Amino acid sequence: MKKPYLLFFLLISLILHSCSVNHAKINNDLKKYFDSSNVEGCFAMLNNQMGDITVYNMNLDTQRLSTGTSFKVIETLIGIQTGRITNEKSTLGNDSSSKNVTLQQAFQNNSVPYFQELARQIGKDTLQMWLDSISYGNSKITSAVDSFWLNNDLKISPDEQLGFLSKLFFEQLPFQKYAQETVANLMKKEDTSLYSLSYATGLGIDEKNNSFAWNLGWIEENRHIYFFVTFIRTPVKSTNTEDRVIEISKSCLKELGFFKGQK
């Protein structure tokens, strides 16, 4: 399924990793979806076929921001690569709060205890090696191995997340093909006759005590693939940031003409 896209990926890979900002189209029409939810945020999309990038809020799109629990995407890749977990049904036996939780459940629910235990089992040096190997954001681990992504050590920009997503989809990351396929399967949310939608969310609290949320994914229509990243933050303590970032993502996609099978 992915082979028809591969040529386009190779052609735009330099854009993704060196000068995507210079090729971006600014779309301020998307601002209303963030305003209506009373959040600050950004949205970025890559049209893989054309190499076009659409951005709302370029300033935020190029800032490195705390990963929060969106770290689960790369941590799952590392966990499978190192054999600490093997598939979607993998459980972790050492931590009482997560020993009966499967990878699939933890991934869907942003389970902090599960991914903390997985990080402890992988180890700090191994995690650091893999973060460095793909230049994942600032690749910074300065606090404890089971909390650095929660304590605002590890940061990545939405623009960098977009490049990471495209490599994941095309299995171009330095991980086993099986690991990348497993993560892609965990991200799949909707599969209809008109479109297929995949994404992973991430939550957290930043240094200024803002609640924030990520939504990272791709949508496919008529064998055309589009990658997107949404980030939101609010100074108001909120328990529904995940719902809001998903809703905003879908509103932006709808504004851009998706979900009709006509792209």
What are these regions (language model features)?
Residues M1-I26:
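Bacterial Sec-dependent N-terminal signal peptides
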